[in-house]
């Protein structure tokens, strides 16, 4: 079985994987104030971060259109297409990708053509390195020679089994989107409180908090170890311009 793995641009591919024809990303659109930024190869992370800091409003995202997903399905030179998206609680990417699958199959049937390309859309229930873990898991299953249905079923189960944890170093976004009042954010910042967050079936939840980034990271690791125990698996981490934090982890 030949295969292609497609994700929205929150799929945190390494530079090496970006060159692999077996992977493809469909860009999200980011809105900061009145400025739209396409999350593709032209994306300037440093400039975007400064733009977000300077904007009093919370940044927004727009998911890829069904048409952009459908075009990727049509152009995929593979027997099977596996699509990985951001948690449906964070973005409309999943629904857009599912609609694109339905449109692709309907057009084939209306044209009297057989639907020979199999497509599975999988909600990662996560983001970033969580999507990457899912992509690498699917690749490994395909390389083992498993059939489409088995890979799709195992990938779906993997999403529900995977754990996601993160620490916020700044509370600006929570303040801007109204999840924290200005007063709460002020006192939390003054006391150097960092929230430890996680995802439960794709929904972001607060797990704990600590004073200082290192204590928060340690608490995050403690929670992860407690919840996963001796379960074998892969640990991946992503940071945003926080190399010292990455080294600490």
Regions found by a protein language model. Give the residues of each.
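Structural motif
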Residues: 4, 80-82
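Short, charged beta->alpha transition segments
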Residues: 65-75, 103, 220
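Mixed-charge interfacial surface used for oligomerization/domain docking
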Residues: 4, 10-24, 29, 97-102, ...
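Short beta-strand segments
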Residues: 7, 85-87, 123
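Short, charge-rich binding segments
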Residues: 71-78, 106-114
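Short Gly/Thr/Asp-enriched flexible loops that form oxyanion-binding sites at enzyme active sites
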Residues: 86-109, 133-135
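Short catalytic-loop micro-motif centered on adjacent basic/acidic residues
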Residues: 60, 83, 121, 236-237
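N-terminal glycine-rich anion-binding loop in soluble enzyme alpha/beta folds
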Residues: 4-68
């Amino acid at each position: 079985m030949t295969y292609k793995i497609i994700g929205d641009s929150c799929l945190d591919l390494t530079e090496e994987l970006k060159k692999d024809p077996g992977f493809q990303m469909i860009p999200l659109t980011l809105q900061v104030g009145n400025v739209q930024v396409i999350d593709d190869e032209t994306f300037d992370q440093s400039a975007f971060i400064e733009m977000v800091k300077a904007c009093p409003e919370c940044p927004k995202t727009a998911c890829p259109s069904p048409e952009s997903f459908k075009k990727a399905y049509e152009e995929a030179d593979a027997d099977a297409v596996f699509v990985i998206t951001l948690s449906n609680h964070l973005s409309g990417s999943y629904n857009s990708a599912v609609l694109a699958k339905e449109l692709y199959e309907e057009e084939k049937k209306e044209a009297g053509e057989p639907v020979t390309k199999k497509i599975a859309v999988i909600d990662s229930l996560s983001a970033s390195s969580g999507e990457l873990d899912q992509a690498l898991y699917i690749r490994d299953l395909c390389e083992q020679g498993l059939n489409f249905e088995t890979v799709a079923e195992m990938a779906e189960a993997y999403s529900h089994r995977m754990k996601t944890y993160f620490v916020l170093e700044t509370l600006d976004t929570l303040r801007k989107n109204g999840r924290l009042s200005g007063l709460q954010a002020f006192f939390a910042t003054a006391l150097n409180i960092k929230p430890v967050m996680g995802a439960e079936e794709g929904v972001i939840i607060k797990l704990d908090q600590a004073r200082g980034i290192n204590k928060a990271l340690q608490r995050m690791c403690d929670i992860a170890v407690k919840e996963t125990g001796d379960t074998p698996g892969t640990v991946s981490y992503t940071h945003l311009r926080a190399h010292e934090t990455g080294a600490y982890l």
